[in-house]
């Protein structure tokens, strides 16, 4: 299983931290994905909050039309994370298949938020102006990898 919002990232107060253990925050996630690529991305996101300022992160599962089930519980075919750095007007998206993926491979799954929207059917950050939303069509992994952003 995997937590969609990790306990280590939700430290606003006791109630918020405790809510990370609610069933609504848990999905059946491949253990190799959870311990490797997913954990690596979560660590990057925590570091980015120090390097790039406040981030707005949306996470969720993606299900096939006829999902595999384990004990009557649907297993996601993939998981997504979309990230917005408001101070810099930068967006980044990821979709990981629900399989074993190494931490070194996370950038192979980076994509524009617009591509994540197409895969999920969701519109992310819809309250932003059209001008800001226009940035969802591109991504710059090298910018996110840099550590000198303030």
What are these regions (language model features)?
Residues 1-150:
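Domain-level detector of nuclease and nuclease-like folds
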């Amino acid at each position: 299983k995997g937590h969609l919002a990790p306990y280590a990232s939700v430290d606003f107060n006791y109630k918020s931290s405790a809510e990370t253990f609610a069933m609504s925050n848990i999905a059946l996630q491949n253990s190799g994905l959870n311990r490797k690529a997913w954990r690596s991305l979560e660590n990057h996101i925590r570091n980015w909050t120090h390097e790039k300022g406040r981030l707005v992160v949306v996470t969720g599962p993606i299900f096939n039309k006829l999902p595999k089930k384990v004990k009557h519980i649907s297993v996601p075919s993939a998981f997504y994370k979309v990230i917005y750095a408001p101070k810099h007007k930068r967006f980044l998206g990821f979709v990981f298949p629900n399989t074993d993926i190494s931490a070194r491979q996370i950038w192979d799954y980076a994509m524009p938020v617009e591509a994540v929207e197409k895969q999920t059917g969701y519109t992310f950050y819809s309250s932003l102006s059209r001008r800001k939303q226009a940035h969802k069509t591109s991504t710059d992994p090298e910018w996110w990898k840099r550590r000198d952003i303030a």
